[in-house]
Each structure stands twice: as structure tokens, then as C-alpha cells.
């Protein structure tokens, strides 16, 4: 799993700071009430982002990439508790891996549950009290570009900026 994270410049210290855990096994009950279990392998590692009594399981190389367990939080904001009290800029990204990579390289970043999540205005208002610039930095695939435009328009009264990196737009 360390090789997976190293590709994105994410070190062990960053993973610990963000409460990201390696999972050997995950057991739960499906929405149909049937128990199931998943096992982590070298080809299909399994990681967990822990937020209190809620866990988001991430399987980067699997068809079913995300699973959720525990008591879901109302406003899922990954990286919020790691933010400094004040800062110049903060990136709002499309996913946890982006938050981890940016943080490992010295940038402040958060993400919501996905790029298609509606960003709560009260969170934007709170961030503006702490940071001079809020920047949307989503993926450059079709969804990311569409949602960047939608979020910038929805949050226009807050003068949220956006950045599109010159990448191919693939995962």
C-alpha cells in the first residue's frame, strides 16, 4: 500500500495525521440485509478514512471503490480538522486522495463526499473567515469540469475561485 500512496507523494505521516488506516478485512451487512466481507490484497488494497463513528472505505483498484460504515455524518468534510486556524488559500478537491496529496506537499485542502456533492454555504462562510482564497480544484474529466462550473456558479456570491490543471482528464 505504501507504493500506492508514494505515487501521489503521500507519506506515512500524512496518512496518520488524516486518520487513514490500512484494512486487512472489512465486514458489514448489505442493504438487502446479507452479511458480506472483503479482504485486502496486494492487487486490491483497502483503506479507511475514519471520521469519528463513521468510516469511508476506499478500494482504489476495485470496481466497487467506496463503501460506508458506521453512523454517517451530516456534513462530510474530509481534512477539515487538519486545517490551520488561518491561511492564505485552501483547495476544495474532488476526493480524499487529492486532499492527502496536496497536504503532503504543504497545501491546505478539504473535500466533500464527492465532486457532485452540494457544498454547504455555512461551511464556505466559515472557511472565508479563516482563508483569503477558496479554490475549487476538481478532476479534469467530464464530471470534474461540469461540477467545477456548477459549484463556481452556485457559490458566486462568495467569489470562490477555480483552477483547472492541464491534465488529460483520466483517473
State what each model feature region is.
Residues 1-41, 85, 154, 171:
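Short, small/acidic-rich helices and loops at N termini and domain boundaries
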Residues 10, 106-107, 158-160, 170:
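Short phosphate-binding/catalytic loops that engage adenosine nucleotides
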Residues 14, 24, 111, 162-164:
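A generic structural-conservation signal
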Residues 25-132, 147-148:
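Phosphate-handling DNA/RNA-contact segment within nucleic-acid enzymes
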Residues 113-118, 139-140, 165-168:
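Short, acidic/turn-prone active-site loops that include or flank metal/cofactor-
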Residues 121-163:
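Modules that initiate DNA replication and primer synthesis
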Amino acid at each position: 500500500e505504501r507504493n500506492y500512496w508514494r505515487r501521489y507523494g503521500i507519506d506515512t505521516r500524512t496518512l496518520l495525521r488524516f486518520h487513514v488506516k490500512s484494512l486487512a478485512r472489512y465486514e458489514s451487512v448489505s442493504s438487502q440485509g446479507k452479511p458480506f466481507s472483503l479482504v485486502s490484497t496486494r492487487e486490491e488494497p483497502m483503506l479507511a478514512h475514519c471520521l469519528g463513528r463513521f468510516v469511508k472505505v476506499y478500494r482504489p483498484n476495485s470496481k466497487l471503490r467506496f463503501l460506508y460504515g458506521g453512523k454517517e455524518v451530516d456534513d462530510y468534510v474530509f481534512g477539515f480538522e487538519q486545517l490551520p486556524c488561518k491561511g492564505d488559500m485552501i483547495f476544495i478537491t474532488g476526493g480524499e486522495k487529492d486532499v492527502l496529496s496536496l497536504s503532503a506537499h504543504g497545501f491546505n485542502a478539504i473535500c466533500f463526499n464527492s465532486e457532485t456533492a452540494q457544498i454547504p454555504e455555512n461551511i464556505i462562510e466559515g472557511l472565508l473567515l479563516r482563508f483569503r482564497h477558496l479554490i475549487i480544484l476538481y478532476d479534469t474529466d467530464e464530471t470534474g469540469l461540469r461540477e467545477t462550473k456548477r459549484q463556481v456558479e452556485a457559490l458566486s456570491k462568495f467569489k470562490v475561485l477555480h483552477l483547472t490543471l492541464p491534465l488529460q482528464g483520466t483517473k
